[in-house]
Amino acid sequence: MDRSQKVILTCMCQISNDDKILILHKVNNSYTGVTFPGGHIEETESLTNAIIREVYEETGLTIKNPVMCGIYDWIQDDGTRYLVFLYRASEFTGELHSSDEGEVEWIKKTDFLIQPLAHGMEAVFEIINNEHVSECFFEISTMKETIR
């Protein structure tokens, strides 16, 4: 029995600076709203190197010691499994700037959930900030998120 499946690997990181976190106002036509920096993992790179690269490309910041917190995943209509590896980081260097992905800004962490969030970001925020939660599986057919 062949158990192989098509998988898309991506990553996302919540960056903290004291009581603030960095948000990205995503402007991609298919995924808009407030999110965290991140993107696709290239075929030859490690997960950690991917999040460091993506954060740098989208923000100008080089994060250090990112910590993997969990996964947000779902099965697309064509059967492809989509995995988002979730990280947090509080050590970084560099000068903050926006990119083609959208505008970036620091906000109070307590203000995150009142932002115009992109789909799934409430669950992402919970996974990153709750040590008792490590995965959210989204079922497209029912539009239901199962957080564990």
Show where each model-derived region lies.
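Acidic/histidine-enriched, glycine/proline-rich intrinsically disordered or flexible terminal extensions
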Residues: 130-148
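Active-site-adjacent beta-strand/loop module that shapes the phosphate/pyrophosphate-binding cleft
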Residues: 74-95, 124-127
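Short connector loops at helix/strand junctions that flank enzyme active sites
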Residues: 8, 16, 36, 63, ...
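A short coil-to-beta-strand element that immediately follows conserved catalytic motifs
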Residues: 62-70
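NUDIX/MutT-family hydrolases
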Residues: 88, 97-129, 146-148
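Conserved Nudix-box catalytic region and its N-terminal flanking loop in Nudix hydrolases
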Residues: 20-56, 143, 148
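Conserved N-terminal beta-strand and adjoining loop/helix that marks the start
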Residues: 1-21
